[in-house]
Curated annotation (Swiss-Prot):
Protein name per UniProt: Protein btn-1
Family: Belongs to the battenin family.
Top-rank taxon, per record: Eukaryota
Membrane topology: Multi-pass membrane protein
The keyword Lipid metabolism is assigned to this record: no
Signal sequence bounds: 1-22
Role summary: Involved in vacuolar transport and vacuole pH homeostasis. Also required for cytokinesis.
BP terms from Gene Ontology: L-arginine transmembrane transport; lysine transport; regulation of intracellular pH
Length: 464
């Protein structure tokens, strides 16, 4: 069933018949008054910490592998494990309690960053990539878990998560530039400091996030359901048993599910036949998600990460006409500008909604074509114009990401929503996987083209 913006907790799209400044002021006031501060902070920190190491690793890609290896190699190691995790985990991860998942994610991500930091330059790049893989598995499992968790805390938790992921990009890229370029710390020291960031997820889950809905739903045990009538009886009984679920805004408004939904989601293990039926139903639901939600998210990620890892390392200008003292500074600064755009657009979901997801996706493809042509033909006269394009790229990418999941929360039935949110998240990792292969080929091709045509700047880059 379709939901209007006002009924879903979102502000209407500017220019829509239902929009007006009075409605905006009233809706904004309502949103601010209804926000459960603890829920918002917890999900913002989830989004921030789950994604910040991923961003730091990509920002450090040039320093990890040097200029002799395509940066797409780091991107592939940073996203392929995450992609595989999100591809298979939605079908079994619901059997693992959220508290256990948090400990697993923190252990994997911290161990990965420590391995990267302590691997000496004399050792093979492959050893560092193992650490990248560990962090990637943690990030993938964390994303689908926290997106699924937003189902129980409503639209504002999704807005907080989206803003946190955008903040991760901004803070991660800025932090790496600040530590290595501005403060002058070594790459090892910078990466070592970041290894302790995942501890914040433990604080967020166990000390900040209200656990009322989760504790209440966990008390409900599963009983086999014989037919539809008995299912309805169980649902009614579940609602009666869940009267003690807190009625704060986190659990009762902004698309929070009913008690029966929580009982079903947190019930104990079903029979074998029910498992088979559930798996078949989930596969069928995944197919129905592809064209309206998965494909536009896939397209935008293919385009933007091909730009970030395959094209931007070759978007170089003479140092005297740029704000940089060395060529290695272009790449991380492009990443920072991109993340600024992502943060702004992912944080705007409560105020601006985009329902036509394919439009920004196709605009992102146009960005890829434009910047690739410049890398070949060198027709953009100033690096500052490229700065604007990269910032616009970030706006488009963040817009598609957060609006895709907002559309799911509005249009997918409540009983399917938790699975749909997690399953759709495979598209961003899938798109990045495709982009990693494209970018490895494109960076080498574009750099060779530039050298052959008298621009050898890409060969002058020295790793930090």
């Amino acid at each position: 069933m379709n939901r209007s913006p006002s009924s879903s907790g979102l502000l209407p799209l500017p220019g829509a018949p239902s929009s007006s400044w009075a409605l905006y002021r009233a809706r904004l006031s309502s949103l601010l008054q209804s926000v459960d501060t603890a829920v918002f902070i917890a999900f913002w920190l989830f989004g921030l910490i789950n994604n910040v190491l991923y961003v730091i690793i990509l920002s450090a890609a040039q320093d990890l592998v040097g200029n002799g290896i395509p940066k797409g190699v780091v991107l592939l190691a940073d996203v392929m494990p995450s992609f595989l995790t999100k591809l298979v985990a939605p079908y079994f991860i619901h059997r693992i309690p959220y508290a256990t998942r948090i400990f697993i994610f923190v252990t994997l991500s911290s161990a990965g960053m420590l391995l990267i930091a302590f691997t000496p330059p004399s050792r093979s790049v492959a050893v560092k990539l193992i650490g990248v893989v560990l962090s990637s598995i943690s990030s993938g499992g964390g994303e689908l878990s926290f997106l699924g968790l937003t189902h129980y805390y409503g639209h504002m938790s999704l807005a907080a998560w989206g803003s946190g992921t955008g903040g991760a990009g901004l803070i991660g890229s800025l932090l790496y530039v600040m530590l290595t370029d501005w403060i002058g710390l070594s790459v090892k020291t910078s990466l070592l400091a970041s290894a302790f960031l995942p501890i914040i997820m433990l604080v967020s889950f166990f000390l900040i996030l209200p656990h009322g809905p989760l504790r209440a739903s966990a008390r409900k045990t599963y009983e086999p359901i014989a037919n539809r009538d008995s299912f309805q009886e169980e649902s009614e009984g579940a609602e009666n048993n869940f009267d003690d679920i807190p009625t704060s805004t986190a659990s009762s408004s902004l698309l929070a599910p009913g008690p029966a939904v929580a009982a079903t989601a947190y019930s104990s293990h079903p029979t074998e036949d029910a498992r088979k039926d559930s798996l078949a139903a989930k596969i069928q639901r995944s197919k129905s998600l592809f064209f309206p939600y998965m494909l536009p998210l896939l397209l935008v990620y293919i385009a933007e990460y091909t730009i970030n890892q395959g094209v931007s390392p070759t978007l170089l200008f003479p140092l005297e006409s740029s704000p940089f003292a060395e060529f290695r500074s272009f790449y991380p600064f492009y990443g920072f500008l991109y993340q600024v755009g992502v943060f702004i657009s992912r944080s705007s979901i409560a105020f601006i909604r985009i329902h036509h997801l394919y439009l920004p996706s196709l605009l992102q493809v146009a960005n890829l074509v434009l910047l690739t042509l410049h890398a070949l033909l060198n027709f953009i006269p100033s690096v500052y114009i490229v700065f604007v394009i990269i910032f616009w790229e970030g706006l488009l990418g963040g817009c598609v990401y957060v609006n895709t999941f907002a559309e799911i929360m509005e249009h997918v039935p409540a009983e399917d929503r938790e699975f749909s949110l997690g399953a759709t998240s495979v598209s961003d990792s899938g798109g990045i996987c495709v982009a990693s292969f494209l970018s490895m080929a494109m960076e080498i091709w574009l750099c060779n083209w530039q050298v052959d045509h008298g621009r050898d700047w890409c060969r002058r880059i020295k790793a930090g």
